């Protein structure tokens, strides 16, 4: 167990944001994020488990690797000494080679001017030196081999160092670096959140007061973090004007926006922006419309079979809120009801490309008794009122087709909520409350396993 300043085996960290997800997907890395939840002051409490076998199980491999690296280092040093010696010898060999060539040239040039005796002496000397020529060539070849071997040893040493680093065989210093890296990753847990059960809603954050009593505002739930555009739709029926602000700051100041004029008017406030398109309910129909902002055109529209519309099955506040579209971590949803379901809330997964219903669930909860609803991680959360004193009262789990009654209060500051939607990118609830655009942070509690267990 690696010694820490907090009681092992848990490392607790406070990171600003919301509840977090597993930061290490590979259990071989050792560190695990076990739970995370949001504290009352809005900080994310991340709990990391440090396995006891962090280095002990690697001691044998680490020791063998260090011994191998020491051997390679010794060989490398010996190669450097040998190279230095052969370099000096090679200079002498090259001098001898030059001398032989000089003698051979002189012998050829003086063939006719030397006496027979002198010529024979030179010839005999050259004959003695000739066998040395092949020796010199072999010596030069061996020298080149030594140079190549030195490079191979150097490369091997670098590879072993990389392996050692990968195995984490640096003892205390290595673990210290790993802890620092872990802390950095844990501090980013708000940007790497996983799914969990809703256990709390923060105090409201009023972003702006703009527009009428009813409306909707949102950001793209699937845009990259650099894209902070805000869309604003005032009113709950027959509207066609959508304002697109460049950033949240521009929305607050009411500047730098463009206008989209929808070809067909909307009904209700249950719109959502998903992957560059607006999904909304066409006025006086049960038709879902997908409007693409960049091309300023309707890409597809489709009826929801049997879905009520035109205030047939609205939320408790009315406002043509028969159909409510939502996006969570798993995709696009529609919340509505039908005569066949006796006015109970139906949750359907929609294909975002074709708008076809992929699967539906009957929650058993009467829609007219619901103030608003939102989806988080495949769970539909329903409030019991749109007025003051409202709380998250009911949860339906699509993964198990089961439900439970909850008691999660939240502060309805302006006493009339007409839009409540969860943004999975920002892990926040967007609310239109009596002409005020409001944000809530949420607390998600979850237990995460990195060992492959569900």
Swiss-Prot record:
Residues 58-85, 136-193 form a coiled coil. Expressed in aortic smooth muscle (at protein level). In the fetus, expressed in the brain and ocular tissues including lens vesicle and optic cup. InterPro entries: Noelin_dom, Olfac-like_dom, Olfactomedin-like_domain. Induction: By TGF-beta. Disulfide bonds join 195-377. Residues 1-20 form the signal peptide. It is found in: Secreted; Synapse; Membrane; Nucleus. Changing residue 144 to Q: No effect on secretion. N-glycosylated. It comes from the Eukaryota. Keywords: Coiled coil, Cytoplasm, Disulfide bond, Glycoprotein, Membrane, Nucleus, Secreted, Signal, Synapse. One of its GO terms (biological process) is signal transduction. The keyword Hydrolase does not apply. PROSITE patterns: OLF. Involved in transforming growth factor beta (TGF-beta)-induced smooth muscle differentiation. TGF-beta induces expression and translocation of OLFM2 to the nucleus where it binds to SRF, causing its dissociation from the transcriptional repressor HEY2/HERP1 and facilitating binding of SRF to target genes. Plays a role in AMPAR complex organization. Is a regulator of vascular smooth-muscle cell (SMC) phenotypic switching, that acts by promoting RUNX2 and inhibiting MYOCD binding to SRF. This is Noelin-2. The gene is OLFM2.
